[in-house]
Amino acid sequence: MEPEIKIVNVVVSTQIGTDIDLEYAADILDNAEYEPEQFPGLVCRLSDPKVALLIFRSGKLNCTGAKSKDDAVIAINKIIKELQEAGMDIIDNPEVNVQNMVATTELGMEPNLDDISTLECTEYEPEQFPGLVYRLSDPKVVVLIFGSGKVVITGLKRIDDAYVAFNKILTTLKELEEELY
């Protein structure tokens, strides 16, 4: 049975083809904040889709908080349209690259994190962080496993990698259980 894996955050980046006057952009974009003494980029928050866009003077744009790459592209295109309507010369449909995805799922059991921490590529310091950190090399992701059975997978570039990583973890946990009990 396939696990139910939910994408909870997608971070993408793009280059919109020209330098941006951030002071001007902050004036014309709704929900934009530009405080260069605190952060070098303009922060623009949209409600539909619910994302935050970081726009930099160089024309680099990052979108975070999306639930899918498609939502991120929709948000980027909304901002591009607003900037174009204000007279800025910006390319249509720039290439959008996924930088990171975060997914969540459940193990369906309450794991013994102390036992799992004996495996290579794991870190578990419950005084500092309640989850066990498990670093996989293929796919290159970080899996956080909590005592409740909740699992967070970060560092994803593709949704398929979440399933591969989760199935590797399940296989490893079954092998560990057979060894220990």
From Swiss-Prot:
One of its GO terms (molecular function) is DNA-binding transcription factor activity. CDD domains: TBP_archaea (cd04518). It comes from the Archaea. Sequence repeats lie at residues 7-83, 98-173. GO terms for biological process: DNA-templated transcription initiation. Keywords: DNA-binding, Repeat, Transcription, Transcription regulation. Belongs to the TBP family. General factor that plays a role in the activation of archaeal genes transcribed by RNA polymerase. Binds specifically to the TATA box promoter element which lies close to the position of transcription initiation. This is TATA-box-binding protein.
